[in-house]
A protein has these predicted regions:
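Noncatalytic regulatory segments and standalone regulatory/sensor domains
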Residues: 40, 53-72, 79-120
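Beta-hairpin (beta-strand-turn-beta-strand) motif
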Residues: 29, 50-52
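Cysteine-nucleophile protease catalytic domains, especially the papain-like/related folds used
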Residues: 1-44, 117-120
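Structural motif
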Residues: 44, 46-48, 77-78
Length: 120
């Protein structure tokens, strides 16, 4: 075990998002096509991927949990704000704006577990 694993999961973030945008929802399990449909309606999604959408470094986490968790050591939560034919666009307060190939985003998003909260 190296370092500290910290994150927020979709149910907790959904509760917070609803305080500001009442129609926000935990859409964990949504496909990338469903995320695109939300974007076409003007709704960004907060997504669980990795920093810069690099390949996930998966491993087990034990401390502080009753069971072992299978998580990405390089997990990162960011906002999906747009797409075109070839790319997804992410906006991250710590990293800035990113343009990620659709195939790479889908691979990372799917591997992490398709976790997302749509902001409506």
């Amino acid at each position: 075990q190296e370092g500290i694993f910290q994150t927020i999961y979709p149910p907790a973030l959904e509760s917070l998002a609803k305080k500001y945008r009442p129609n926000s929802a935990d859409i964990t399990g949504a496909s990338v096509e469903e995320l695109e449909k939300e974007l076409m309606k003007g709704n960004p999604s907060i997504v669980w991927v990795t920093a810069y959408c690099r390949n996930p470094e998966m491993g087990y986490w034990y401390e502080g949990t009753p069971d072992q968790l299978w998580v990405a050591k390089n997990l990162h939560v960011t906002t999906l704000t747009g797409f075109d034919e070839d790319y997804y666009y992410l906006t991250d307060p710590g990293i800035g704006k990113l343009k990620i190939k659709k195939s790479q985003f889908k691979y990372v998003y799917d591997t992490i577990g398709k976790k997302a909260v749509v902001v409506r």
